[in-house]
Amino acid sequence: MRFTSCCGAVLICAGASVAGAQQFPPEQIKEGAAIYAKHCATCHGNHMKNPPWAIDLATFPRDERARFVDSVTNGVRNMPPWGDVINPEGIAALWAYLVDGEK
């Protein structure tokens, strides 16, 4: 009984992590790539491999979407705010590109 309960808990957790995986439509990723190339690559690098002065987006935590949205919208440290330039849909597309675009 105990073994069955433990196996069930493991399977539930494994299913939750797969179910929680983010998947984005290819069009959204493509839009995010275009926005990234236009507004972000200068500082963050062509493939999210940053120069020494910017955060390495290739390793940005994929479970911190809210932090990403806030940083892009309002700026953080030396990064200017982009909320007046990139609309919420564009920021969502950037997130899709960050998560799924550079595999």
Q: Language-model segments: what does each one mean?
A:
Residues 51-58, 73-103:
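Axial heme c-ligation environment in periplasmic c-type cytochrome domains
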Residues 8, 35-38:
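Disulfide-bonded cysteine motifs in exported proteins
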Residues 10, 69, 95:
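A cross-family signal for key residues in well-ordered alpha-helices
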Residues 40-43:
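Short cysteine clusters
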Residues 1-8:
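Bacterial N-terminal signal peptides that target proteins for export
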Residues 13-35, 103:
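Electrostatic cytochrome c docking/interface patches
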Residues 26-33, 45-76:
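Gly/Gly-Pro-rich "capping" loops immediately C-terminal to redox-active cysteine motifs
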